[in-house]
Amino acid sequence: MSLVETVRNTLVPVHKEGYRFIAIFFVVSLILGLLWEPLMWIGFLLTAWCAYFFRDPERMTPIDEDLVISPADGRVSSIATVTPPEELGLGSEPMLRISVFMNVFDCHVNRAPMSGTVRRIAYRAGSFLNAELDKASHDNERNGLVVETSHGAIGVVQIAGLVARRILCWTTENASLEGGERFGLIRFGSRVDVFLPEGAQPRVSVGQKAVAGETVIAEFGSSKGPLISRRA
């Protein structure tokens, strides 16, 4: 293996959405260095943090249509049975909601929790409350996806937080998504809610760490044995 290949395999890729921010941090660091050298080194540390924030590592996603995979890196902040947001069009019957909160040190690339077809994308403007608060699901700016899966329609909602002020969603209505596939990103601290129909059983606990594209957060039916994974 060549040196270039070794470095490429060792370093975690940075998502292209972060290039502009990294460049801004770097240039500002150089300018600050002209005023006072220690400021430049502080700026370089912040530049390194920015690159770390926008990291986009590969993940090994379990292949099983009965499994629901975490859509985000972070901490499971809530597991509850609630009425889904009206804009999703999922009806008024309560659904299982599993929430994953991302702090500013978590990877913020969002991934599809199940394979299926995107039937609806609904954006709603709102506040920028702390995303860990339960009322953030209703009050904060959010972008919701309805994905038709083999177990029925599920909802995936990207929620802006106290620091996050930009929700990005790259998929489109009628597009097909594979479980673990990247579909969006939220900048600088946020939350993702997954709404699941009857039959889904949670496989995580509140406070547990979840890894996007890898951690099984819920399941339809019972486990059938060893998992098979694919790189995503």
Swiss-Prot record:
Pfam families to which the protein is assigned, alphabetical: PS_Dcarbxylase
Record pathway: Phospholipid metabolism; phosphatidylethanolamine biosynthesis; phosphatidylethanolamine from CDP-diacylglycerol: step 2/2
Keywords of the record: Cell membrane, Decarboxylase, Lipid biosynthesis, Lipid metabolism, Lyase, Membrane, Phospholipid biosynthesis, Phospholipid metabolism, Pyruvate, Zymogen
Annotated cofactor note: Binds 1 pyruvoyl group covalently per subunit.
PTM comment, free text: Is synthesized initially as an inactive proenzyme. Formation of the active enzyme involves a self-maturation process in which the active site pyruvoyl group is generated from an internal serine residue via an autocatalytic post-translational modification. Two non-identical subunits are generated from the proenzyme in this reaction, and the pyruvate is formed at the N-terminus of the alpha chain, which is derived from the carboxyl end of the proenzyme.
Record-marked site positions (Cleavage (non-hydrolytic)): 189-190
GO cellular component: plasma membrane
PTM annotation (Pyruvic acid (Ser)): residues: 190
Domain of life per record: Bacteria
Main location: membrane
Protein's membrane topology: Peripheral membrane protein
Location of the protein in the cell: Cell membrane
Cofactor (UniProt): pyruvate
Any one GO BP annotation for this protein: phosphatidylethanolamine biosynthetic process
Enzyme Commission number: 4.1.1.65
Record-annotated active site: 190
A Gene Ontology molecular function term of the record: phosphatidylserine decarboxylase activity
Function: Catalyzes the formation of phosphatidylethanolamine (PtdEtn) from phosphatidylserine (PtdSer).
Subunit and partners: Heterodimer of a large membrane-associated beta subunit and a small pyruvoyl-containing alpha subunit.
NCBIfam families for this protein: PRK05305.1-1, PRK05305.1-2, PRK05305.1-3, PRK05305.2-5
Protein name listed in UniProt: Phosphatidylserine decarboxylase proenzyme
Organism from which the protein derives: Sinorhizobium fredii (strain NBRC 101917 / NGR234)
